[in-house]
């Protein structure tokens, strides 16, 4: 009785932390706050005029839409002229919007708050790792894990100002939810347990709305539940298993419920994965039921039999899941590292190699020190877990969760470079565990306090070398990122020119990397045909145009309603990827085989210095003297296949070999200011013409034709803006005294002219050709000079006309033909339901379509449903994975059906409603036809069903100045 009273008394007594322990906790937390603030400072050093990360320009625009509209569904600037439904979870933007609403009280504007948001996420992440570390091991583990995270390059890479992607907020929220989960599972006070559990479920559920990669969090939590369930059962801890199931399973179900509910308004976007996770969870529930109640029928007498039961059920479950889901079962988060030709060329989606790990987890230099510290820490946690399991008989939640978190993070780290950041939390945590374990060991030593203090001090100083040496280097790097490529290369001026000198509904494109810059309200504020997250099927078509020459490179850009094409000279550095995606080179030539052999350099610029053209990085020197050209590559002398001189047009043929007998399959183009060494397969690429002004082509006259369709209108730094027209005139000849002579201007009076037309990627059909007489920018007369019933864009011919011209300052040649007009301003609706503008109807579906369209002037238009197929045809290699495979991009565009006619569109915004039906089989039959034609050589990249307005449209072909009459 006395013993019982004593026990009850002890039970009622509050456990207090000794004063030194409290001091250590307070001091550790203050240190963590200091380093979190230091980490925030470093991460905010990158804040400048623009964002360092191109994708963040897009995220900024959606963030502004959230502030304006609440829950926007549509982004009008992408995939011109159609726009795009927002595919990212709105939670990614709601979080910084809430942050802005709070700090705007202190005078911060939208942009300033957005620049502060990623460093703030980094600040909170440091605190989160501290709390998680102290829960997993001890105060030291949390503190040192936080210190390491504050200056870790891997974590900095996604939490610096100007990089506002979703993985940062997600990992921050997930880390805090993990802390709450561990407190929930280990708390004995019922009321506190309810509070911890509620917060855990809410925060874990909300975290899934921050990033489309948030299934990682659900899988970590599910993996932890699975391992704990199985291990407790195998070790015969049935009572503990019952308690764990009672506590954890309802919580996980609540997380799934919140995650799914957030997908309904678009705040989250992982509904499909939530359903999959629920199905897997049901499998785990079934396994748990068998464990708890199967003892009546199965042999649970020892660990071997219990393990056998689990093994059989798990194997059967995987087999069933594979039958149900298919091969995708083993591609967790596979969307982040899909194996397509485009993704092969995106650096962050490439497979992680050891060099990446050394850089992102290095201290002072690429050495991977933090990665190794984390590995040792993981071993310590594993050893502690096994000890507790076998010796103490406890159910160690903290260690098992940490191991699960670490293992799954490392797994993803090696799948794609983009996950180097994601793994930083687990690796920093385990690095802190290593430090915490060492310091805890010192504390428990039976030595005198001075000796322990000295040892602890030495260890602390050694650990402090990580932030003390790496922090300043990271800060220096951050400062250099403040000024972006936009400001130093000509992009800023070019895009501002575009915004200030083109109509509001104009569209523009470049290589896809720069699409978000074109769209940004900070820069171009114009619709882009392709960018880093939309219209990825078009990437191949852009590459085809840039990397190829002649008829095959003629793309129907008019179907995109393209107005301006921006060429960036520095894209020579990306030209291997462009050439590969455009079908000019093979996979081996692009990036080498598994041993790196066979890779080529497709383009190499050689700036001119005196009489030499030099690229010191590549050790290439070109000496030009009179009619001879000497090319030195390292210690070899090489003779290109051909040398061309611009503007003289002179050429010198060579052997294509080097002095050591190796092949040198390159063509050298020399201009007055720069030389270009080009791999023979891309030696006449359109990019070389447009970027460097080299009129090289395998097709006589093609360069002249190209420049009639692409007219340079602005240049700044390394960026050239071209105005695109699908129909141009590249040469005018006049019959002067019985002889046809090329003329460059016209005079008032009678003329007999021959017009050489370039139709780029699109036929001329039922068109009328006019000359507009212009006087002081005003049209004073329109003169009809010809009608063209049909002209194939692959087989143009000159048009002979007779015309009498009035007095004017210039004469404008204009082709009037039906073509696509207008841009969508809002998401289209079918029967009141929002639809993708590029997949507006399904086969056999009908309904009322509602469109909001903007036009730059009044039109009478017809409305069509149009199909666009973008696909690749393998033209070499045994299969699609062959290193010798090359893929020819194709784009087929055809009208399906007219769904509206004589629609009156007024300048500005218009709302149009029509009844429409997509005939059954029209898409599938064309797809089947392609598959029959190309077999296993076919890869379909995109199938679109688009609403397109067609109206009489004026195409400016050429404008020439007027001169005095001939004498």
Curated annotation (Swiss-Prot):
GO terms for cellular component: plasma membrane. A glycophospholipid binds at residues 418, 516. The lineage of its organism: Archaea, Methanobacteriati, Methanobacteriota, Thermococci, Thermococcales. Residues 1-21, 134-135, 187-193, 237-247, 291-306, 382-396, 440-453 are cytoplasmic. It catalyses: an archaeal dolichyl phosphooligosaccharide + [protein]-L-asparagine = an archaeal dolichyl phosphate + a glycoprotein with the oligosaccharide chain attached by N-beta-D-glycosyl linkage to a protein L-asparagine. Belongs to the STT3 family. PANTHER family: DOLICHYL-DIPHOSPHOOLIGOSACCHARIDE--PROTEIN GLYCOSYLTRANSFERASE SUBUNIT, DOLICHYL-DIPHOSPHOOLIGOSACCHARIDE--PROTEIN GLYCOSYLTRANSFERASE SUBUNIT STT3B. Disulfide bonds: none annotated. Residues 43-112, 157-165, 215, 269, 328-360, 418, 475-967 are extracellular. Residues 511-513 are annotated as: Interacts with target acceptor peptide in protein substrate. The chain crosses the membrane at residues 22-42, 113-133, 136-156, 166-186, 194-214, 216-236, 248-268, 270-290, 307-327, 361-381, 397-417, 419-439, 454-474. A motif (DXD motif 1) lies at residues 53-55. Its EC number is 2.4.99.21. It is a multi-pass membrane protein. A motif (TIXE motif) lies at residues 345-348. A motif (DK motif) lies at residues 571-578. This is Dolichyl-phosphooligosaccharide-protein glycotransferase 1. A motif (WWDYG motif) lies at residues 511-515. The record marks 55, 348, 574 as: Interacts with target acceptor peptide in protein substrate. It is found in: Cell membrane. Keywords: Cell membrane, Glycosyltransferase, Magnesium, Manganese, Membrane, Metal-binding, Transferase, Transmembrane, Transmembrane helix. It is an enzyme of class 2 (transferase).
